[in-house]
Amino acid sequence: MRIAVIQFPGTNCEHETLVAVRECGMDGEIFRWNRPEQELCEFDGYVIPGGFSYQDRVRAGVIASKEPVMATLREEAANGKPIIGICNGFQILVESGILPFGDGVRLALAQNVMIRGGEIVRRGYYCAWTMLRHDAEEKRCSGSYILRRGEILSIPIAHAEGNLVASDRKVIERLIEDDQIVFRYCSPQGEIINEFPVNVNGSTENIAGISNPEGNVLGMMPHPERAFFAWQLPRKHPRIPGYGPGRKIFDSMKRYIEERRS
């Protein structure tokens, strides 16, 4: 089971993402953006990791979205192969039009705007541990394949532009109706509170992650590779054995591929 971890200039999370892929028993490989894109077809799945591709120039993800490798990823997505875009990877998937519907750019991941009590308390880059509620049906999405609806995960964010917005409210309504909202920022009890610090970036409907209509492509702003091992979790004595909740994202991809093959 071969997984390509796509590396663009400025990507900075490829190595820890590769560790997560391999720890789950998949054969991971860093795939540079300037390799012959036809070689991508040899892989069973793909992860576009976080970082700041092309230094986020113009806007986050837009330059990487124009690279030839993304046209090939679009074709592989149409063939049903799983893709997970994390943070900048999510931004690239949105800018390329693969998410949300595969028919062009319908969303934007705008600058973070933190609102509390009706007032803007902060803008821009924010790094913190967040709580996510899994809002999709079980097996609806390749990147959350093993999660139950309503399951709560603690996974960190680190971004300046994760505020998911749409100029047309019908786009958001379609995401809701088609069960494409995979993760939403929530309280520790699972409540959806549209206010900072629960909604960490001002995202519409507290959206933290979405899928395409077919469910094989997931884009999410939080970083599961940073919550993969238990020692990464925020505790007084962090070096404990075992795994954190982020592992479930990568295990989901593996299970999705296995069941798709059978």
From Swiss-Prot:
Entry's Gene Ontology BP terms: 'de novo' IMP biosynthetic process
Disulfide linkage: none
Matching Gene3D superfamilies: 3.40.50.880
Compartments where found: Cytoplasm
Reactions catalysed, as given in the entry: N(2)-formyl-N(1)-(5-phospho-beta-D-ribosyl)glycinamide + L-glutamine + ATP + H2O = 2-formamido-N(1)-(5-O-phospho-beta-D-ribosyl)acetamidine + L-glutamate + ADP + phosphate + H(+); L-glutamine + H2O = L-glutamate + NH4(+)
Active site: C87, H223, E225
Keywords, comma-separated and alphabetical: ATP-binding, Cytoplasm, Glutamine amidotransferase, Hydrolase, Ligase, Nucleotide-binding, Purine biosynthesis
Residue ranges crossing the lipid bilayer per the database entry: none
UniProt pathway: Purine metabolism; IMP biosynthesis via de novo pathway; 5-amino-1-(5-phospho-D-ribosyl)imidazole from N(2)-formyl-N(1)-(5-phospho-D-ribosyl)glycinamide: step 1/2
Main location: cytoplasm
Domain of life according to the entry: Archaea
E.C. numbers: 6.3.5.3, 3.5.1.2
Matching SUPFAM superfamilies: Class I glutamine amidotransferase-like
This protein's GO CC annotations: cytoplasm
Signal peptide annotation: none
Domain Glutamine amidotransferase type-1: residue ranges: 2-238
Single GO MF annotation: phosphoribosylformylglycinamidine synthase activity
Functional summary from the UniProt entry: Part of the phosphoribosylformylglycinamidine synthase complex involved in the purines biosynthetic pathway. Catalyzes the ATP-dependent conversion of formylglycinamide ribonucleotide (FGAR) and glutamine to yield formylglycinamidine ribonucleotide (FGAM) and glutamate. The FGAM synthase complex is composed of three subunits. PurQ produces an ammonia molecule by converting glutamine to glutamate. PurL transfers the ammonia molecule to FGAR to form FGAM in an ATP-dependent manner.
Subunit details: Part of the FGAM synthase complex composed of 1 PurL, 1 PurQ and 2 PurS subunits.
Descriptive protein name: Phosphoribosylformylglycinamidine synthase subunit PurQ
Organism: Methanothrix thermoacetophila (strain DSM 6194 / JCM 14653 / NBRC 101360 / PT)
